[in-house]
């Protein structure tokens, strides 16, 4: 080795060792515009891209805790956990899939239910977690949904549910399909008693969830560009052998065709839900809006 190679080799090795390693997870990429984003900034922005306003998928527990007033949340039916009663096996055993999903998410199942206050108004809230087996609906989801609805009925308070699901959980076969009827039945009881149910459809809301509880709200809200439908657009195109309209099954298309009532930005969701709950329960708006301030002036 020549003297210059020795010097260059020493310099390059010392410079590479002095480079500080960037910890994993500090940066992430927008799933729409592919802009590289600082993860902490994205969290502060409620997982909405600050560059293109794309609403990314949002962790269920974080969503509910950010919706409710601080320190007001009480989890409902947290003890319920799915069981592999059918001993189901496809490429993997169902119990192994459950274990992997529980380890990945830190949750027992794909659905979280809570009681708390929203701008000091008591409410029951629930959310699907898409990261847990695609937010699929099984027996535990149905049981927790009913328990949450029963709490809303008992206290005569609004029930708000955020959907993010691929549909019924195939590993539970007919047990999962039964949850469509079970959740629809309790919502019929809520409607009969005049207890408000607000459904918020987020990306994606598909299959048995969209065909049951997700579209049965007294008011159906969607986040921008959420994919909403029964089968996905690719499956429909292959079935009907036709090209679907642009934006088909997206929230904006559904709003234009009267399938949902409104589209709300995530940053506005908390205040919008509070105003709707107040109107639907005949209570004063829990905070002053710009319109009220103008009226009082």
Swiss-Prot record:
Residues 26-295 form the CoA carboxyltransferase N-terminal domain. Transmembrane segments: none annotated. It comes from the Bacteria. PROSITE patterns: COA_CT_NTER. Component of the acetyl coenzyme A carboxylase (ACC) complex. Biotin carboxylase (BC) catalyzes the carboxylation of biotin on its carrier protein (BCCP) and then the CO(2) group is transferred by the transcarboxylase to acetyl-CoA to form malonyl-CoA. The gene is accD. PANTHER family: ACETYL-COENZYME A CARBOXYLASE CARBOXYL TRANSFERASE SUBUNIT BETA, CHLOROPLASTIC. Acetyl-CoA carboxylase is a heterohexamer composed of biotin carboxyl carrier protein (AccB), biotin carboxylase (AccC) and two subunits each of ACCase subunit alpha (AccA) and ACCase subunit beta (AccD). Residues 1-23 are annotated as: Disordered. This is Acetyl-coenzyme A carboxylase carboxyl transferase subunit beta. GO terms for cellular component: acetate CoA-transferase complex.
